[in-house]
Amino acid sequence: MLNHFPGHCSNNIFCFPPIESETKSGKKASWIICVQVVQHNTIIPITDEMFSTDVKDAVAEIFTKFFVEEGTVRISKMTRITEGKNLGKKNATTVVHQAFKDALSKYNRHARQKRGAHTNRGMIPPMLVKYFNIIPKTFFEEETDPIVQRKRNGVRAVACQQGDGSILLYSRTEKEFLGLDNIKKELKQLYLFIDVRVYLDGELYLHRKPLQWIAGQANAKTDSSELHFYVFDCFWSDQLQMPSNKRQQLLTNIFKQKEDLTFIHQVENFSVKNEDEALRLKAQFIKEGYEGAIVRNVNGPYEPGYNNYHSAHLAKLKPLLDAEFILVDYTQGKKGKDLGAILWVCELPNKKRFVVTPKHLTYADRYALFQKLTPALFKKHLYGKELTVEYAELSPKTGIPLQARAVGFREPINVLEII
């Protein structure tokens, strides 16, 4: 859960990123909000388990630090959180979880107030998809049905209004789009009728145009004013726990405020009762020339993609691609259960390399293979072989297959027999 929040831990204290501004005298000022957990007058390490289970005799404390360059640090009084909220309910929070939610709310509120001077100008990274071609059963276990939307193969974009009334349109990686005046002009008109604090999350797209062309237009300072902005979600920085179905209702209300827009559109929602209905819609969308479908858990909160976090409340459905690539090396995973498990390294014709996860090997087999496969055995039996790889898409920047999984070798090879 810690990776849901921006910032880092140091000496058992979690600090959100500093919000910077400038004093009247031109000096740099920094405001930081922090959370710590105290048990028997001792600050203890913050763990992910604390977000689901309370720690006996522990309380959470929120405090802020403010300092001006060449000045002293001022520390606020502690705000103590001694119990969670909504106890006994499905959305109950622990002491620590509630403290982080309160701190994040204050952080976002302060960031918005200082956005003119803040380094990222109030940018919040958009929510990212965790599941690919899998719809979790939990999506259908709630009282309401999940919704399905068309998946466009465009460029992710988030829009918000700045303190001076200007429109900020930025990418998944928090890079500002400098052009797109046709879209910004309509957004400015729309924000005259809606809550100025709302963020609009969507995709820059023009139907049947290739992604490379769309990306080129999106990143140009002077574009051809052909791209459209398809909005599929909205959120408020201080209400990220708002469920998806409520956000969709509010998004519909937003678009009712001004219905004469040309370049901004609300994405259509389809309610489904089971996975088969979702798959039928995916097939329909593909026939229409779209990339596939997005499935949303209507009870899910908006979870920003801080530290590349991917939300378990979103699923993407699209056709798998496959191709043969030359195997040139092997390595292991870097963290968690993938550490010590073999990964294949393939090479593109342009000599760029990418890592591929074996699809049909168990973790036990992958551990054994990495331990016992020597460079000499690899060179003798596997180097230069063609490996069939399934992947979601090619990276528009590098051409490397994304979410690559090795199906098998073109010629029959049992890699476990090699060792």
Curated annotation (Swiss-Prot):
Cell division found in the keyword field: yes
Feature type site, description Important for the catalytic efficiency: 153, 211, 402-403
Region (AD domain): 121-317
Swiss-Prot/TrEMBL keywords: ATP-binding, Cell cycle, Cell division, DNA damage, DNA recombination, DNA repair, DNA replication, Ligase, Metal-binding, Nucleotide-binding, Virion
Protein residues bound to ATP: 151, 203, 232, 294, 316
Additional observations: Consistent with its intracellular location, ASFV encodes its own replicative DNA polymerase and three base excision repair enzymes: a class II AP endonuclease, the repair polymerase Pol X, and an ATP-dependent DNA ligase.
Task of the protein: Very low-fidelity DNA ligase that seals nicks in double-stranded DNA during DNA repair. Together with the viral repair DNA polymerase X, fills the single nucleotide gaps generated by the AP endonuclease. It is not essential for viral replication and recombination. Displays a very low adenylation activity towards DNA with 3'-dideoxy- or 3'-amino-terminated nicks compared to regular nick DNA.
Family: Belongs to the ATP-dependent DNA ligase family.
Protein name in UniProt: DNA ligase
Organism for this UniProt entry: African swine fever virus (isolate Tick/South Africa/Pretoriuskop Pr4/1996) (ASFV)
